[in-house]
Design a protein with these regions (language model features):
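Auxiliary Fe-S-binding modules of radical SAM enzymes
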Residues: 1-27, 74, 179-252
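Canonical Radical SAM [4Fe-4S] cluster-binding loop centered on the CxxxCxxC motif
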Residues: 13, 20-62
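Short glycine-enriched, charge-decorated loop/helix-capping segments at active-site entrances
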Residues: 52-56, 147-153, 221-229
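Short, conserved loop/turn and helix-capping segments at secondary-structure boundaries
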Residues: 61, 151-154, 231-234
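Conserved AdoMet/S-adenosylmethionine-binding subsite of the radical SAM
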Residues: 68-82, 87, 91-219
Length: 252
């Protein structure tokens, strides 16, 4: 099991760290969503546009009740969509996330978890049952490139993807297309074949690399290695989409 930071328990409920939240439509799960960003991440993705979420103790420490006092204002809207938990990496705060998911299901809300899957072994059966959709970010198909790109191993993510398939949990696959890093046609084809094989990938989102997070790296004094990398061309994006479609997947 992967070691995680300590989360303080308050009675039968968890207390954890919330970085921020926002509303969205369509990209973070079906319908109108409240997107809750949990603090903390063990990956160090070179293209991360939210490095300010890496610190486990950034944001605001809150109880489940305090979080829900904020969420309840959005519930009428969320009936037409749901709530998505992201980060950072939400599974860093696994017990806190589990309590948040349970509270959401008690209010009959659709739930989604946006995760890189590296900590998927922290998802027990009860938590799995409270997740309606997983937005699975697979950063790269080649294990060596994955390690260079994220600082972590690829295999735990693939194991989690297989578990999700066994549990018949729907997945939206997310893939950031970075010229020179994740745009190798062989890697894209390998991931497409894997996604088709597991059989539970409902949608594939090809996300073009951008430089919108560059200023955050500078503010945090971090070494940003992609200063001179340009976004992929429309042709590169279309090519990646067509590769996934060639395996019978719904890609956009």
């Amino acid at each position: 099991m992967t070691e995680l930071p300590v989360i303080h328990e308050v009675g039968q409920r968890s207390k954890g760290w919330i970085h921020s939240w926002e509303t969205s439509a369509g990209q973070d799960g079906p319908g109108w969503r409240l997107v809750v960003f949990l603090s903390g991440c063990l990956l160090r993705c070179q293209y991360c546009h939210n490095p300010d979420t890496w610190n486990m103790y950034s944001g605001k420490e809150m109880t489940i009740d305090e979080v829900w006092d904020e969420v309840k204002h959005y519930v009428p809207m969320l009936r037409r969509g749901g709530i998505t938990f992201t980060g950072g990496e939400p599974l860093v705060q696994a017990s806190f996330l589990k309590s948040l998911l349970r509270r959401a299901k008690e209010h009959h809300l659709h739930t989604a978890v946006d995760t890189a899957g590296f900590l998927g072994d922290r998802v027990d059966e009860d938590m799995m049952n409270d997740i309606d959709l997983v937005l699975l970010d697979i950063k790269c198909w080649d294990p060596e490139k994955y390690l260079e790109l994220t600082s972590k191993e690829l295999e735990p993510t693939l194991q989690f993807a297989r578990r999700l398939a066994e549990a018949k949990r729907p997945v939206w696959l997310r893939y950031v297309l970075v010229p020179g890093l994740t745009d190798d046609p062989r890697d894209i084809e390998g991931l497409a074949a894997f996604a088709a094989e597991v059989g539970n990938v409902e949608r594939v989102d090809i996300l073009p690399f951008h430089q919108l997070g560059k200023s955050k790296w500078a503010e945090l004094g971090l070494d940003y290695k992609l200063q001179n990398v340009h976004p992929p061309s429309p042709e590169q994006v279309r090519s990646a989409i067509e590769t996934f479609k060639g395996y019978g997947l719904n890609a956009c």
